[in-house]
């Protein structure tokens, strides 16, 4: 029997990853193509969509060189990508200007103006953040009116790749939920919100679920890459939802905490549970009739790396000094607001601080405070998600910070839930995208395909320190109003 393969393409900010897996979800291999970001002015962040295609070609050429037979057997392709980017296309299908990326802050005034219109939070379930797509178009309308007048379609980054792959203008729910134009509960474009930014539904791609077929690979590309048969392209997902598909975080009660540069607490939901006033993202998931909530802190390992630079010690050495056994908080409190904070404060101007320093506060005590500060910021996220109706009974930890068992014990104890460490493997967005490609091509049950990884180890809350951690969290939580009065 012929063995089919499935390809996941993840378009990140710094590169594209192409991952090949078989029908048993065994990863055959992966390859990358690198990308640069252009920053022509302060706060601007752009990429040329032609560079995405070149990077995708590089990554797929890498797979073809190493795994030509396997690439030839590809039956399904899934897409994942950086969210929120505004790719503007004219009536001839040409790109009008460089894509304005998710981390571009030029449209902060336009975002504030749209967010002041109560319809946006009511319909989308989210704050209109400067990084989202709608304020970018409002900025273009105001500052580049000749370009805005030529806009025929607005595409998110991965959906521009789909246009190249298939010739189709299609998006899906999880990525589109980050535009500020989607009626997130109804899973459809809002004509009302589009009109508020001078657009209408004809400017938008058609919508499918992430598990649906959303085009077929063009014969020219199939021939170039040596793909023999018909290759279906799935709807795919935004990067966080694709990662959740890779992690198996697709059912009510499933959650993961990501300790990267920033921190994310992501929970899958069987229903739509918006709470924009807590700066919780309430988005559609990549699977039908599923949503997700996400809390974001802007400095997770970033805070530890900052402290590492101050002390001249590596992050691993600093956390190693604490040992494996969780310690009671010392009374030193760290607020990790080094570049502002997202959830629950939505405050770009707030800045970090150490509180409670004394002669006894040595390097070890401050390391402990930094880890606890990030832990308590994640606890703030948990409380925000709980207030919106989400229940989390355990979390899976991913990201560079998850290598510290001490840090995970701190998180388990403060959140009051077990923290699972997955066995080694690739559970990222490219793997999640490949899973969506498999589902679209075969009609397999998404919940059966998107299983959770094997657990290598579970870290339980330290019951004896529960009270001390709760007291320290309350102290941390009370700091924000005082720090805010000094930061603004």
Located regions from the model:
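N-terminal glycine/serine-rich phosphate-binding loop of ATP-dependent small-molecule kinases
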Residues: 1-98, 122, 150, 222-223, ...
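Alpha-helix termination/capping residues and helix-transition junctions
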Residues: 68-71, 80, 201, 249, ...
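Short, basic and Ser/Thr-rich N-terminal targeting/leader segments
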Residues: 12-15, 73-75, 80-82, 133, ...
């Amino acid at each position: 029997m012929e063995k089919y393969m499935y390809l996941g393409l993840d378009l990140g900010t710094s590169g594209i990853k192409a991952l090949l897996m078989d029908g048993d979800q065994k990863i055959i291999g992966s390859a990358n193509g690198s990308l640069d970001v252009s920053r022509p002015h302060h706060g601007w962040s752009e990429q040329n969509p032609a560079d995405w295609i070149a990077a995708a070609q590089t990554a797929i050429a890498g797979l073809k060189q190493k795994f030509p037979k396997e690439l030839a057997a590809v039956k399904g392709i899934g897409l994942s990508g950086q969210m929120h980017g505004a790719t503007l296309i004219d009536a001839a299908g040409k790109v009008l200007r460089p894509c304005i990326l998710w981390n571009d802050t030029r449209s902060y005034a336009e975002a504030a103006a749209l967010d002041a219109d109560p319809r946006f939070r009511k319909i989308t379930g989210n704050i209109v953040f400067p990084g989202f797509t709608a304020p970018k178009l409002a900025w273009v309308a105001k500052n580049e009116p000749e370009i805005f007048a030529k806009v025929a379609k607005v595409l998110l980054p991965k959906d521009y790749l789909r246009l190249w792959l298939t010739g189709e203008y299609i998006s899906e729910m999880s990525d589109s939920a980050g535009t500020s134009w989607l009626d997130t509960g109804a899973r459809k474009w809002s004509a009302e919100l589009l009109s508020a930014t001078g657009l209408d539904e004809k400017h938008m791609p058609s919508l499918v679920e992430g598990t649906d077929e959303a085009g077929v690979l063009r014969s020219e590309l199939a021939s170039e890459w040596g793909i023999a048969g018909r290759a279906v392209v799935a709807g795919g997902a935004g990067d966080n939802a694709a990662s959740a598909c890779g992690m198996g975080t697709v059912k009510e009660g499933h959650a993961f905490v990501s300790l990267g540069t920033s921190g994310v607490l992501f929970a899958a939901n069987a229903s739509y549970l918006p709470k924009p006033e807590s700066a919780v993202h309430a988005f559609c998931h990549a699977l039908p009739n599923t949503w997700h909530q996400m809390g974001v802190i802007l400095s997770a390992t970033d805070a530890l790396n900052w402290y590492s630079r101050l002390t001249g010690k590596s992050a691993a050495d600093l956390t190693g000094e604490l040992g494996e056994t969780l310690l009671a908080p010392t009374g030193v409190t760290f607020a990790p607001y080094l570049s502002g904070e997202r959830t629950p404060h939505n405050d770009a101007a707030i800045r970090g601080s150490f509180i409670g320093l004394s002669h006894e506060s040595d390097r070890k005590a401050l390391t402990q405070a930094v880890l606890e500060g990030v832990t308590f910021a994640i606890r703030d996220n948990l409380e925000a998600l709980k207030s919106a109706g989400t229940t989390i009974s355990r979390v899976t930890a991913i990201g560079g910070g998850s290598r510290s068992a001490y840090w995970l014990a701190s998180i388990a104890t403060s959140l009051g839930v077990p923290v699972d460490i997955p066995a080694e493997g690739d559970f990222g967005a490219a793997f999640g995208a490949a899973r969506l490609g498999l589902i679209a091509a075969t009609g397999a049950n998404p919940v059966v395909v998107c299983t959770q990884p094997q657990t290598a180890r579970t870290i339980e809350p330290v019951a004896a320190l529960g009270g001390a951690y709760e007291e320290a969290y309350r102290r941390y939580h009370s700091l924000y109003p005082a720090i805010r009065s000094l930061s603004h």
